Each structure stands twice: as C-alpha cells, then as structure tokens.
Amino acid sequence: MTRDDLRQAIFGSFDGLTSALGVIAGLLAAGVHSGGRILAGALGVAVAATIGMGAGEYLSDTSRSPRRALVMAAATLAGSIVPAIPFVTGYGRSQVIACGVLTICGALVIGRYRGYRITLGILAIVASLTVGLSVLVA
C-alpha cells in the first residue's frame, strides 16, 4: 500500500463512518425503530457515499491512476458498513450503543493507524450523540 493509498483509505473510511452514523442518527431521531429499516437507510448512504467519493476522487484528477478512486470507494464502503453492523440483529438500546461504540472504535483505529490522535472533541461529540440517542430510544 502506497502512502497515497493510505491517505485515500483513511479519508474514505472516516467519511463512510461519519456519513453512516449521521443517517442512522437521523433515522433514530425520526422515530424509526426497526433494524431492517435502519439497515436499509445505512445501505443507501453506503452506496451513495461510495459512488460519490470514488467518482469525486477520480474526476478531481483524471490524469492520475484510477486506483486512487478505487481505494477511496472501497474504504468509504467499508467505513459505511461499520456503524450499521449492530442493527443486523434487530433494534434496541444495545444496538444503538453498539453502533456508537463501533463508530468510536473505528475512528480510533483509523486515527491510530495514521499516527494521529483523534481529537477529544470529535470523540466527545460521537459519544454524546450515542448516549443521547440511547436515551431517546429508551
């Protein structure tokens, strides 16, 4: 993996994580209490984000190898799937909390792999969102 691939992978996976979490949070806030519907929403954003990030990367510099766009798209798809994993088993408070925990862990892994520390502010926002959503669900 080249340094450029690593950059695309980090950018794409973090974008996927946050995009999917945003859609899931919106669905929960709108009162969706079905694991299947949350998965459908997460799948929709995963497909849209993957196409958008991959195409955007390719079109931003067509003189470069399409490999960059493929790495970006694959990483975005992978990142988008992580927050949705708990809802495969259904819907409930534990799935909402697991969604937040997996997203935080994913962000930490991405940041750690790159050698950066995820700022406390980002993690505090994600944690607050997770706790807030679980309280709303209860």
Regions found by a protein language model. Name each.
Residues 97-115:
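Transmembrane alpha-helical segments of integral membrane proteins
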Residues 1-103, 120, 124-138:
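Hydrophobic, small-residue-rich transmembrane alpha-helices and their short perimembrane loops
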